[in-house]
Amino acid sequence: MNYDHILIRFGEISTKGKNRKSFIERLKQNIRLVLKDYPNLKYFSNRDRMTITLNGEDPEALFPHLKQVFGIQSFSLAIKCDSRLDDIKATALKAIKDQYKPGDTFKVATKRAYKQFELDTNQMNAEIGGHILRNTEGLTVDVRNPDIPLRIEIREEATFLTIRDEKGAGGLPVGSAGKAMLMLSGGFDSPVAGFYAMKRGLSVEAVHFFSPPYTSERAKQKVMDLAKCLSRFGGSMTLHIVPFTKTQELIQKQIPENYTMTATRRLMLQIADRIREKRNGLAIITGESLGQVASQTLESMYAINAVTSTPILRPLIAMDKTEIIEKSREIGTYETSIQPFEDCCTIFTPPSPKTRPKKEKIEHFESFVDFEPYIQEAVDNIETMTLYSEQEANDKFAELF
């Protein structure tokens, strides 16, 4: 059967009222970006659907890309025919015969966007179902759990028939909800937090704190690899590498040992906030999960948050470690996160960090130290790079020759 289109169904975009048009346009841009290596494709979108005309491109090659685009509820290979009853019946029968084997069940589900069509939805289901039953053997109807779900979408300009649905990533198109900075370490949590933030439509830029010689170049490469993993869901990932050695050394010298972790997090948050402001972001994302470690108690979060009024988003706040690790496997960051290269937070962890720090105490300790020059020096010497998934990176390298 010659499937010549892909039909894309939107998720939450359909509920966005007056903003629907901008959401759909953003989704179209994101789809074009991940499918940019397929120049023959043509795109058409309406209120709650998008259609891609293949023009000879291999549809199976497109599926892995489409599954990673947030904002897509599901998508299907589709056959296009004229919106005439006889044409629809003939196309439906041909599609079923191409798929079924004796003993299979099927269901017809019609969506009639073209209200002037001669039959209503129920009449159409009965007409097409009866036509298929009369012209096949060993095929029966099952409206609850069919082996072959035949969907028919009747529009004025054409009708589309689909048989197999592929599940999309759901959520909202990346970039439709604004920009935020992700505090990206080398562990399991922050990449998963970044994934969930992108799923809610945020354009994410990553911030990593690097403290050589205490942390190695391999630890830095690990974070770059994690950013590449996340870039699959947004087309690319901007990563800001913050030189943090001098600041951490000062903290170790000037702040009481059991409060060094709290001070470190507060300084990190202030630097991330400066980057956010320069990059026109509106929030900061962390991988914190309530009570998971000493710095993630409610008292710690309160003391750390006090340095900024910027919204701090914590997508993992109610998840446990097992759930987070399972999600990291699902999104492809697990194998990188498990590599044994420590980041600056683990290198300088005190033996007995304060689990319930007092905001007044850490402010008192910090009042004896002028951190501002160190913050500004770190911001002035940030290394910024744009990273792509391995396939996109290979394509860009090939373009140089």
From Swiss-Prot:
E.C. code: 2.8.1.4
Keyword Zinc-finger included in the entry's annotation: no
ATP-binding in keyword set: yes
Subcellular location: Cytoplasm
InterPro entries, A to Z: Rossmann-like_a/b/a_fold, ThiI_AANH, ThiI_fer, ThiI_N, THUMP_dom, THUMP_ThiI, tRNA_STrfase, tRNA_sulfurtransferase_ThiI
Catalytic activity: [ThiI sulfur-carrier protein]-S-sulfanyl-L-cysteine + a uridine in tRNA + 2 reduced [2Fe-2S]-[ferredoxin] + ATP + H(+) = [ThiI sulfur-carrier protein]-L-cysteine + a 4-thiouridine in tRNA + 2 oxidized [2Fe-2S]-[ferredoxin] + AMP + diphosphate; [ThiS sulfur-carrier protein]-C-terminal Gly-Gly-AMP + S-sulfanyl-L-cysteinyl-[cysteine desulfurase] + AH2 = [ThiS sulfur-carrier protein]-C-terminal-Gly-aminoethanethioate + L-cysteinyl-[cysteine desulfurase] + A + AMP + 2 H(+)
GO annotations of cellular component type: cytosol
Principal subcellular localisation of the protein: cytoplasm
GO molecular function list: ATP binding; CCA tRNA nucleotidyltransferase activity; tRNA binding; tRNA-uracil-4 sulfurtransferase activity
Record-annotated THUMP domain positions: 60-165
GO-annotated biological processes: thiamine biosynthetic process; thiamine diphosphate biosynthetic process; thiazole biosynthetic process; tRNA 4-thiouridine biosynthesis
UniProt keywords, alphabetically: ATP-binding, Cytoplasm, Nucleotide-binding, RNA-binding, Thiamine biosynthesis, Transferase, tRNA-binding
Binding of ATP, residues: M183, L184, H208, F209, R265, G287, Q296
Record pathway: Cofactor biosynthesis; thiamine diphosphate biosynthesis
Role of this protein: Catalyzes the ATP-dependent transfer of a sulfur to tRNA to produce 4-thiouridine in position 8 of tRNAs, which functions as a near-UV photosensor. Also catalyzes the transfer of sulfur to the sulfur carrier protein ThiS, forming ThiS-thiocarboxylate. This is a step in the synthesis of thiazole, in the thiamine biosynthesis pathway. The sulfur is donated as persulfide by IscS.
Similarity annotation: Belongs to the ThiI family.
UniProt protein name: Probable tRNA sulfurtransferase
Organism (species): Bacillus subtilis (strain 168)
